[in-house]
């Protein structure tokens, strides 16, 4: 399996911090892998810790750097930056998926690209850094990870509201309204939603999440990225 046999030194270089090897392995261990290997510990406790650190670091940064924004706008921006959609983009930017330790079924069903798994693992890594190196290092990691989003206003806007951003991009290309199709799989208590969006035949993209809204947002961001990256191929009027 890919995650088991991958040298993690390149990941540490991208993260810009050293992490105890055992803690890093735990941060990368999805519950499906833990279950298939005798119930070893998984990364969910680290995810819980990292979620709190992430929220605090983002809150403080937004508060300090945006003195003119009211509470509602600050909350909206924070929600976008800590969303599964945004964190999954962060994870893809550092190639985190190839390092995940997944069970066979999860791996075969595309778990390395699932937004929810990628986002949860980012939080687990943040938690691992906090335990190994302390709060300052963990906060610094958070700021490095979200830096690319904050430095790119267009991408930040897309992460905040991917469906609106995609609609605007589609209009720019004369493609009409994006059309979404959503299905769900799994038991009632643990459904996974899979969304596909078609943008006037120019782009078709997919996304998944634990809710219909989350899946549509993931698909919209993927489609927005594709349209943005391939503007040169689009006929201009």
Swiss-Prot record:
A Pfam family cross-referenced in the UniProt record is Ribonucleas_3_3
Domain RNase III positions: 8-134
Q: What class of enzyme is it?
A: hydrolase
Gene Ontology process terms (BP): mRNA processing; regulation of gene expression; rRNA processing; tRNA processing
Oligomeric and partner information: Homodimer.
Q: Give the family per the record.
A: Belongs to the ribonuclease III family.
Protein name, UniProt field: Ribonuclease 3
Species this chain originates from: Leifsonia xyli subsp. xyli (strain CTCB07)
């Amino acid at each position: 399996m890919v995650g088991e046999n991958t040298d993690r030194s390149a990941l540490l270089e991208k993260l810009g911090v050293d992490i105890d090897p055992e803690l890093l392995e735990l941060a990368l261990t999805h519950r499906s892998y833990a279950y298939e290997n005798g119930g070893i510990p998984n990364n969910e406790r680290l995810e819980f810790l990292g979620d709190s650190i992430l929220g605090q670091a983002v809150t403080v940064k937004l508060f300090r750097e945006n003195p003119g924004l009211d509470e509602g706008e600050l909350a909206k921006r924070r929600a976008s930056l800590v969303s599964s959609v945004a964190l999954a983009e962060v994870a893809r930017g550092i190639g985190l998926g190839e390092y995940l330790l997944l069970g066979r079924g999860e791996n075969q069903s595309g778990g390395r690209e699932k937004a929810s798994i990628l986002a949860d693992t980012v939080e687990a890594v943040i938690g691992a850094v906090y335990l190994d190196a302390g709060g300052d290092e963990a906060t610094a990691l958070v700021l490095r990870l979200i830096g690319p989003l904050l430095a790119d206003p267009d991408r930040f806007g897309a992460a905040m509201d991917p469906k609106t951003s995609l609609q605007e991009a589609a209009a720019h290309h004369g493609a009409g309204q994006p059309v979404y199709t959503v299905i769900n799989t799994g038991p009632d208590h643990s459904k996974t939603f899979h969304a596909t969006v078609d943008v006037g035949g120019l782009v078709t993209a997919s996304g998944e999440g634990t809710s219909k809204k989350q899946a549509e947002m993931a698909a919209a961001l993927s489609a927005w990225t594709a349209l943005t990256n391939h503007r040169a191929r689009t006929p201009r009027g």
